[in-house]
């Protein structure tokens, strides 16, 4: 058990008791009511307790790509830098990159992430060791080649079955076709069928750039969402669509009608000059908007508090509307909405919810006066949380990793980077 004493929880100073992996009680919990030998007691004095953040679009091993290819367009970034480096990946490099990314996320309050990449065995190993929660998809790209398609689908199916056999409630599987401009119709149709067969979500890149939309238009005479919808890609499945930068009204209507979750990546989209997602229109249509960081190669951070602030600011600016995306809305994008997208019983601090939360010491200049803490978390907090509990287990205590040797992670990451770039 874990007992957090005297923290600010939902606006009030109170205690929180964790039993197993569930928040058992919020209120007054005297120490005398728990077994001291079996309970981790955390002093929450001067701390606010918040739900763990949920990052709905990542490529976690790409933490090793941080700063590698800055300030260039997306297609040049991919073809000239990222894809050539990815051809050198191996299990050791992916493991090191995942460890580094998981540590960064935990230390900035993220308790769950939605990932699409390769070498899933290595990703799973690192996720298991660090204690973070994850939905993991094998990234499929067939480039319209039949032989490649069969291999990709076989690999994706194998990964889903492997994750299910783990029987680890923190690690769940998904299907990850890269995008409509890199995946054939046959692969996308098979993805929907497999998602229904295995009861897993789909994670896909959509409408990130004008160029990719034009590629799909040229091939199909339809925009990407219209094209995928024409053969039932979104039917009877949960779909998380990353980016959604360039959308017309028809596509927004499809997103709403098919209950698609949008993973908004404002910083990555700005850095690659992809554009700004029409969040104002999405909100008007009651679309569930979540937040993602994308990979470190295009961000260069996994700090979701930065995404909250950017999301709250950029849409005010481009729409000349100071009330658009409030601090409360931005915070929910990064917590409750993300939890809904990944079907995680978290995202808010309530009895019966999963014990995924972070503690933040409010005795900091940028969190004072504490009466305005909801605003501070979005507009002024730097993301450096003090303690983190994931699935009822303490993973970060007083700013230091509990589950893994942090110094060793940095050593492995440096070694992996040198191997990747030699």
UniProtKB/Swiss-Prot annotation:
Gene3D superfamilies: Metal-dependent hydrolases (3.20.20.140), Urease, subunit C, domain 1 (2.30.40.10). Its cofactor is Zn(2+). Zn(2+) binds at residues 57, 59, 205, 294. InterPro entries: Amidohydro-rel (IPR006680), Deaminase_MtaD/DadD (IPR023512), Metal-dep_hydrolase_composite (IPR011059), Metal_Hydrolase (IPR032466), MTA/SAH_deaminase (IPR050287). The keyword GTP-binding does not apply. Binds 1 zinc ion per subunit. Pfam families: Amidohydro_1. Keywords: Hydrolase, Metal-binding, Zinc. One of its GO terms (biological process) is S-adenosylmethionine biosynthetic process. Pathway: Amino-acid biosynthesis; S-adenosyl-L-methionine biosynthesis. SUPFAM superfamilies: Composite domain of metallo-dependent hydrolases, Metallo-dependent hydrolases. It is an enzyme of class 3 (hydrolase). Disulfide bonds: none annotated. Its EC number is 3.5.4.41, 3.5.4.31, 3.5.4.4, 3.5.4.28. Substrate binds at residues 86, 178, 208, 294. It catalyses: 5'-deoxyadenosine + H2O + H(+) = 5'-deoxyinosine + NH4(+); S-adenosyl-L-homocysteine + H2O + H(+) = S-inosyl-L-homocysteine + NH4(+); S-methyl-5'-thioadenosine + H2O + H(+) = S-methyl-5'-thioinosine + NH4(+); adenosine + H2O + H(+) = inosine + NH4(+). GO terms for molecular function: 5'-deoxyadenosine deaminase activity; 5'-methylthioadenosine deaminase activity; adenosine deaminase activity; metal ion binding; S-adenosylhomocysteine deaminase activity. Catalyzes the deamination of three SAM-derived enzymatic products, namely 5'-deoxyadenosine, S-adenosyl-L-homocysteine, and 5'-methylthioadenosine, to produce the inosine analogs. Can also deaminate adenosine. The preferred substrate for this enzyme is 5'-deoxyadenosine, but all these substrates are efficiently deaminated. Likely functions in a S-adenosyl-L-methionine (SAM) recycling pathway from S-adenosyl-L-homocysteine (SAH) produced from SAM-dependent methylation reactions. Belongs to the metallo-dependent hydrolases superfamily. MTA/SAH deaminase family. SAH is a product of SAM methyltransferases and is known to be a feedback inhibitor of these enzymes. As a result of this inhibition, organisms have evolved efficient enzymes to metabolize SAH via different pathways. The pathway found in methanogens differs from the canonical pathway, it uses the deamination of S-adenosyl-L-homocysteine to form S-inosyl-L-homocysteine for the regeneration of SAM from S-adenosyl-L-homocysteine. 5'-deoxyadenosine is a radical SAM enzyme reaction product which strongly inhibits radical SAM enzymes. Homotetramer. This is 5'-deoxyadenosine deaminase.
């Amino acid at each position: 058990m874990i007992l957090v004493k005297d923290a600010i929880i939902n606006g009030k100073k109170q205690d929180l008791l964790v039993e197993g992996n569930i928040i058992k009680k919020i209120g007054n919990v005297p120490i005398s009511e728990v077994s001291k030998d079996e309970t981790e007691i955390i002093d929450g004095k001067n701390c606010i307790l918040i739900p763990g953040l949920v990052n709905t679009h990542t490529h976690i091993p790409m933490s090793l790509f941080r700063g590698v290819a800055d300030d260039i367009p997306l297609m040049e970034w991919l073809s000239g830098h990222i894809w050539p480096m990815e051809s050198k990946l191996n299990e050791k490099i992916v493991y090191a990159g995942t460890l580094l990314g998981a540590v960064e996320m935990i230390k900035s309050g993220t308790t769950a992430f939605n990932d699409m990449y390769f070498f899933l065995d290595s990703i799973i190993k690192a996720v298991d060791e660090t204690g973070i929660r994850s939905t993991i998809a094998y990234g499929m790209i067939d480039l319209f080649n039949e032989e490649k398609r069969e291999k990709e689908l076989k690999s994706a199916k194998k990964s889903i079955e492997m994750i299910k056999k783990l029987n680890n409630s923190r690690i769940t599987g998904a299907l990850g076709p890269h995008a409509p401009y890199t995946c054939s119709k046959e692969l996308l149709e098979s993805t929907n069928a497999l998602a229904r067969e295995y009861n897993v979500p789909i994670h896909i890149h959509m409408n990130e750039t004008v160029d990719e939309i034009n590629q799909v238009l040229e091939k199909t005479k339809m925009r990407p969402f219209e094209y995928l919808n024409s053969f039932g890609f979104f039917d009877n499945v949960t779909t998380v669509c990353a980016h959604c930068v360039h959308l017309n009204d028809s596509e927004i209507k499809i997103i709403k009608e098919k209950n698609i979750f949008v993973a908004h990546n404002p910083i990555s989209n700005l850095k690659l000059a992809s554009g700004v997602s029409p969040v104002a229109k999405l909100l008007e249509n009651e679309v569930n908007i979540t937040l993602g960081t994308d990979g470190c190669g295009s961000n260069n951070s996994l700090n979701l508090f930065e995404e909250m602030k950017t999301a709250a600011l950029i849409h005010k600016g481009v729409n000349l509307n100071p009330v658009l995306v409030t601090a409360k809305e931005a915070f929910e994008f990064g917590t409750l909405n993300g939890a809904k997208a990944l079907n995680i019983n978290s995202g808010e601090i309530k009895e019966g919810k999963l014990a995924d939360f972070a503690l933040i010491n409010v005795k900091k200049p940028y969190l004072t006066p504490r009466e305005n803490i909801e605003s501070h978390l979005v507009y002024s907090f730097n993301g450096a949380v003090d303690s983190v509990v994931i699935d009822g287990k303490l993973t970060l205590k007083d700013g230091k990793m509990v589950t893994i040797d942090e110094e060793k992670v940095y050593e492995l990451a440096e070694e992996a980077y040198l191997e990747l770039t030699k």
